[in-house]
């Protein structure tokens, strides 16, 4: 075998030409201590606040504390396998999550990783968890209604696109039910929804996902789940991951709704994180910046100006109170940040008034700007009348001799309470709400004072349900005209009055029921 020098030199030249110097340089540190989801790391001198770092076992962490000789890192995953002395490296990336329509119909964790077993998510865009909220110039006042499908809310505590409306109440009063009904009602309205479950049982989240699937709402909804068994950092960052996903729709000329269920648990997770990071505690052991935690989150919900694309992100944060105490630290913080609150009361819930909305304490600071004209026409004085009824009902318990006007007000109020009762998972289109409320509050004829005046109180719920069925069958144009014109014109009033009169002639009250 002949060895040719020129052949060998040619091969060596090719090897030298194709040689690539593949050396990766990473700034590394060492774990000093680890426990309860927090690691202290020595050596990451160039680390940024909010930067992701990677531990030796592949688990990621988020830099929260920058101190003279170490950094405090929140571990975003299982910290049991991390040991003192392990190597940690910087990723030089600020924490971000995948966003886009690819996440619709999926259940993900706060890092955007799928939890539903449907395979990887093919999102092409990512967004940072923490970004600055839109400024004053970028915003527009809230003026479009976001229909919840719940009569008591759309009539008395209206929510607009871009608003922050707090849902507050004790446990087991129907807070999540109000939020889920609102999500279900967005079907066909081009509103994308994000449901953020913070510190909840996995079985509870599974039930919510199952209900959303059953009513066809998962096709436009993303569920961000941080379960009760997840580390505190995951529970703390879940709302920020959800709002980053919602901002994608807001900034791309679309409308989105985000539900935080619930921010009380996020505050508890943040308190745990802060105490483990040795930050000084304040009132109720919460750190001093817990107000800022919620304000910077909720300020990202906005209605953008026409120049910015006119998109919107509406937030429905949920807060759980203890024994109805709305003056506690976290409830008062969030009440002061939001544009109104829906207060759910235990006593009303157990009295069978569901949704258990306390109309006196609930308020929307956007008001009738977030209502269609037809709803303004029929529900204008409803809140005042209900408040008067509650006051009179309290006094009526002590006296039996009531004058006729008082008896009339009490009877009318009792019917109005019945009118506002609504089953779970039964959101109602706004035009049908208007038809029902018109029947109860019509003021065109002062002698009538409502078409259901002579209907027994116990039959009001059945009357409302059967009236809509009757109107759909015999007078379908009334609902169609209301939906298209969005106001009660003289023609619609005439047609609606005719439909109610015809129905009252055929309605059969329950035998023996009191009027």
From Swiss-Prot:
It holds the Pfam family ATP-synt_ab_C. The record marks 362 as: Required for activity. Keywords: ATP synthesis, ATP-binding, Cell inner membrane, Cell membrane, CF(1), Hydrogen ion transport, Ion transport, Membrane, Nucleotide-binding, Translocase, Transport. The keyword Magnesium does not apply. Coiled coil: none annotated. Produces ATP from ADP in the presence of a proton gradient across the membrane. The alpha chain is a regulatory subunit. The gene is atpA. It comes from Myxococcus xanthus. It is found in: Cell inner membrane. Transmembrane segments: none annotated. Belongs to the ATPase alpha/beta chains family. Signal peptide: none annotated. Its EC number is 7.1.2.2. Its main location: membrane. It comes from the Bacteria. GO terms for cellular component: plasma membrane; proton-transporting ATP synthase complex. It is a peripheral membrane protein. F-type ATPases have 2 components, CF(1) - the catalytic core - and CF(0) - the membrane proton channel. CF(1) has five subunits: alpha(3), beta(3), gamma(1), delta(1), epsilon(1). CF(0) has three main subunits: a(1), b(2) and c(9-12). The alpha and beta chains form an alternating ring which encloses part of the gamma chain. CF(1) is attached to CF(0) by a central stalk formed by the gamma and epsilon chains, while a peripheral stalk is formed by the delta and b chains. It catalyses: ATP + H2O + 4 H(+)(in) = ADP + phosphate + 5 H(+)(out). ATP binds at residues 169-176. GO terms for molecular function: ADP binding; ATP binding; proton-transporting ATP synthase activity, rotational mechanism. It is an enzyme of class 7 (translocase). This is ATP synthase subunit alpha.
